[in-house]
Amino acid sequence: MDKKELINNGKVKSVYTTDDENAVIIEFRDDMTAGDGARKEVMNKKGSYNALISTKLFKVLEENGIKTQFIDLPETNVMVAKKLEMIPIEVIVRNIATGSLIRKYPIADGTKLDPPIVQMDFKADEFHDPMLNDSIIKALGLATQEEIDELTEKALKINEVLSEFLLEAGIILVDFKVEFGKDKNGEIILGDEISPDGCRLWDSETLDMLDKELFRKGKDNEVMDAYVEVYNRIIPDDEKIEL
């Protein structure tokens, strides 16, 4: 399947139309950004590792009854996916308090959150992705109450499945963000990606960071080692690809 027209050139991914009106090609680039794109670097093979990690996690979710937009991975950094009408909401699930949560609220760093916090942000760079609530979502026409409830339910199910899967690999899923869209039938399914770019991942023994937070903290030389470590832990040896 060949890529045709560029329809979205994001911070780290490019999306193209294909000869199938119901499918798109998502190209994972080697770009790494922070601070709403204010800081940008290129990390060798980062796009491929993110695509491979996302593919594995999408397959795990599919095996557990959670529909995703994934179709195929013809190249290590190229994903063929179902075309979705994306909902401009980032759904964030937090299992452990850290990051922006402890900066905004009186809660100690490292506090286990039980039940997990589900947060929704407006995906809009020009407004710096402000936090939403149900009333704002409905006022902006982003989703109905029924859809808000569905997004919450799906995000918590994703959290349940991936927390267990990753812990078996010695990784704590601290928090993560996901995006959803509607397919040609109007069904809401998981889209975009799930990778160390959009998750906080800690080693379960040392609590070392294995995600993009390393880049945010200026530890550029440790970033790709962490991404490779995640890949090596979650991909069985017989499925590994030499990059």
UniProtKB/Swiss-Prot annotation:
Enzyme class name: ligase
EC id: 6.3.2.6
SUPFAM superfamilies: SAICAR synthase-like
Protein name listed in UniProt: Phosphoribosylaminoimidazole-succinocarboxamide synthase
Similarity annotation: Belongs to the SAICAR synthetase family.
Organism domain of life: Archaea
Keyword presence, Transcription: no
Metabolic or biological pathway: Purine metabolism; IMP biosynthesis via de novo pathway; 5-amino-1-(5-phospho-D-ribosyl)imidazole-4-carboxamide from 5-amino-1-(5-phospho-D-ribosyl)imidazole-4-carboxylate: step 1/2
Catalytic activity as recorded in UniProt: 5-amino-1-(5-phospho-D-ribosyl)imidazole-4-carboxylate + L-aspartate + ATP = (2S)-2-[5-amino-1-(5-phospho-beta-D-ribosyl)imidazole-4-carboxamido]succinate + ADP + phosphate + 2 H(+)
UniProt cross-references to InterPro entries, sorted A to Z: SAICAR_synt/ADE2_N, SAICAR_synt_PurC, SAICAR_synth, SAICAR_synthetase, SAICAR_synthetase_CS
UniProt-listed Pfam families: SAICAR_synt
Signal peptide location: none
HAMAP family named among the record's database cross-references: SAICAR_synth (MF_00137)
